[in-house]
Amino acid sequence: MRCLVVLLAVFALSQGAEITRIPLYKGKSLRKALKEHGLLEDFLQKQQYGISSKYSGFGEVASVPLTNYLDSQYFGKIYLGTPPQEFTVLFDTGSSDFWVPSIYCKSNACKNHQRFDPRKSSTFQNLGKPLSIHYGTGSMQGILGYDTVTVSNIVDIQQTVGLSTQEPGDVFTYAEFDGILGMAYPSLASEYSIPVFDNMMNRHLVAQDLFSVYMDRNGQESMLTLGAIDPSYYTGSLHWVPVTVQQYWQFTVDSVTISGVVVACEGGCQAILDTGTSKLVGPSSDILNIQQAIGATQNQYGEFDIDCDNLSYMPTVVFEINGKMYPLTPSAYTSQDQGFCTSGFQSENHSQKWILGDVFIREYYSVFDRANNLVGLAKAI
């Protein structure tokens, strides 16, 4: 079955079927923008909510801490309405709702971004239902409607979309993305909302019920592909991992080792593959073990710094997933900015789940197979 998945997806690519490629560009992170405006320290001090709150929201109210998006840098273009209005969105496999700012939102965050005007769209229909997503320091309030969303060559009609009427604080003011397009399972979506990719599948708008993500380390060639697997973005073979809970893209990690010694996830643990989270997030005790092993030291805001001169001496961290080893070298799990190096590992106090974000996806081409509820991983080029 797994070989058939690859053959069909690659065949579809070669035949030029409904294959949709969305170039992702690497923009300025929210962290860097806040730092430039002198707001980063205040933001970090005010964040009281753990990463895991993103993974506990159901019904009309969802919870997503802003720290999830602090280092996100990969964004793409979509178009909403008739005639189309352009938006930059974060494609997020860790959530399922789709929302953009609207003209009814007067907060600074909305004023600094593209705002959707439903009055100018002949295809917009007001659903008359509220949407609320909690973001640590406040809530995004909005309304739900239907409209046509265009993603590259796909025209997706009658798509539910959230239109924000209020966005929290000033933090989103400096984000390079306007809105968020969730790509997790429909069980995570707000009430009355259908995820964009589900609507595409239901209307047979994609060649295969899967999508794949390549995140270029330099940000120049990053790509989201809907309906196909593109072998030009990886080397070797794809290895398949069963989804254990059909809410997130969740699977079992066997262990995390350094030099053959288990340092985290002993006996196995659950992990989520999440394009909307930038770092590698895990339980506090596990992350502390890893930070100590790689020589990272905690700063006053709870983040971990690394001496850039030590990168060549630091160990490789290996994730074992479904019997396959996925090594991460120091250059993969650290980031460097203006002479400062930071660990790509982040602790979470309130969850035993791991979150494998962009740090992992940059190293491993990722396939999200809804038809068979599998995740495919291969070494990225």
Swiss-Prot record:
Q: What is the effect of changing C341S?
A: Propeptide is not cleaved
Keywords, alphabetical:
Aspartyl protease, Digestion, Disulfide bond, Hydrolase, Protease, Signal, Zymogen
Which segments constitute the Peptidase A1 domain? Answer: 74-378
Query: What EC number(s) does its UniProt record assign?
Result: 3.4.23.4
SUPFAM superfamilies, sorted = Acid proteases
- Active site location: D92, D274
Please give the superkingdom of this protein's source. Answer: Eukaryota
Q: Which residues form the propeptide?
A: 17-58
Coiled-coil intervals: none
Disulfide-linked positions: C105-C110, C265-C269, C308-C341
Question: What are the GO MF terms of this UniProt record?
Answer: aspartic-type endopeptidase activity
- Which enzyme type, at the first EC level? hydrolase
Question: What is the recorded phenotype of mutating G302D?
Answer: In chymosin A
Signal peptide start-end: 1-16
Q: Which reaction does it catalyse?
A: Broad specificity similar to that of pepsin A. Clots milk by cleavage of a single 104-Ser-Phe-|-Met-Ala-107 bond in kappa-chain of casein
Q: Name the Gene3D superfamilies for this protein.
A: 6.10.140.60, Acid Proteases
Q: One GO BP annotation here?
A: digestion
The record's function comment reads: Chymosin is synthesized in the mucosa of the abomasum (fourth stomach) of young (unweaned) ruminants. The enzyme hydrolyzes casein to paracasein.
Q: Which family does it belong to?
A: Belongs to the peptidase A1 family.
Quaternary arrangement and interactors, per the entry? Monomer.
Its name, as the record gives it, is Chymosin
Q: Which gene encodes it?
A: CYM
